[in-house]
């Protein structure tokens, strides 16, 4: 989490307006989705390109979990990872645990408010090398919101698994509650800065079977 807030978010804000003049279908789709969301929330009329980028910056500062912001963050971070400016931070226990679980034939997947593109870049360019082959699937807010139980049902269906056969790990109690309501097993990850507040907790991936 600290890597996201201390490195990725500042990098996004620093480079955001460099993309204002970029003409691509991908950027246009993000701006169209931004305008649609502004209209739904505020009833605002059509905004120009600069105003839309300013709104994306405002959402970033508010840490809004909205799809167009997450999509643009993924694009900007992708360039940072590809140029080597960014390297994905993972705790020392993560890579060995992923290798162990993968060798045991367990299906590993990620669900994050960050876009699928950003997830793949972070784990594909980590300080421990490319960890992305360990994962069978990646999910983001296009699947649903992280505090909605139906999202976890959809994820289990996508993995062709019963929720009862899935273990969901998170540091956020509200997300754990949603996954539990969907029928998943849950464990809270208690890293530095996180307060233990769940019936099943782990401070290290090595503590998880």
Question: What kind of region is each of these model predictions?
Answer:
Residues 1-58:
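Conserved phosphoryl-transfer catalytic core
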Residues 2, 121-124, 180-182:
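Short amphipathic alpha-helical segments
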Residues 40-92:
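Metal-dependent phosphoesterase signature
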Residues 83-127:
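Substrate-recognition element of Asp-dependent hydrolases with the DxDx(T/V) motif
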Residues 133-209:
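Asp-based, Mg2+/Mn2+-dependent phosphohydrolase catalytic module
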Residues 78, 82, 115-117, 173-175, ...:
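Short, solvent-exposed loop/turn segments at secondary-structure junctions
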Residues 100, 107, 125-145:
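Surface-exposed, interaction-prone regions with an acidic/low-complexity signature
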């Amino acid at each position: 989490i600290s890597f996201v807030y201390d490195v990725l978010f500042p990098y996004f804000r620093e480079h955001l307006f460099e993309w204002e003049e970029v003409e691509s279908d991908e950027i246009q789709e993000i701006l169209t989705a931004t305008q649609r969301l502004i209209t739904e929330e505020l009833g605002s009329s059509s905004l120009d390109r600069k105003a839309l980028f300013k709104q994306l910056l405002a959402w970033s500062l508010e840490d809004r979990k909205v799809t167009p912001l997450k999509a643009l963050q993924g694009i900007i971070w992708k360039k940072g990872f590809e140029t080597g400016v960014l390297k994905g931070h993972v705790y020392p226990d993560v890579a060995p645990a992923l290798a162990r679980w993968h060798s045991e034939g367990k299906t590993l997947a990620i669900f994050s408010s960050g876009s699928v593109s950003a997830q793949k870049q972070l784990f594909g360019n980590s300080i421990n090398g490319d960890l992305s082959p360990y994962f069978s699937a990646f999910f983001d807010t296009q699947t649903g919101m992280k505090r909605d139980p139906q999202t976890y049902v959809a994820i289990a269906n996508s993995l062709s698994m019963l929720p009862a056969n899935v273990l969901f790990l998170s540091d956020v109690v509200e997300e754990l509650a949603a996954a539990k309501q969907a029928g998943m097993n849950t464990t809270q990850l208690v890293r530095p800065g996180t307060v233990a507040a769940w019936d099943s907790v782990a401070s290290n991936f090595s503590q998880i079977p």
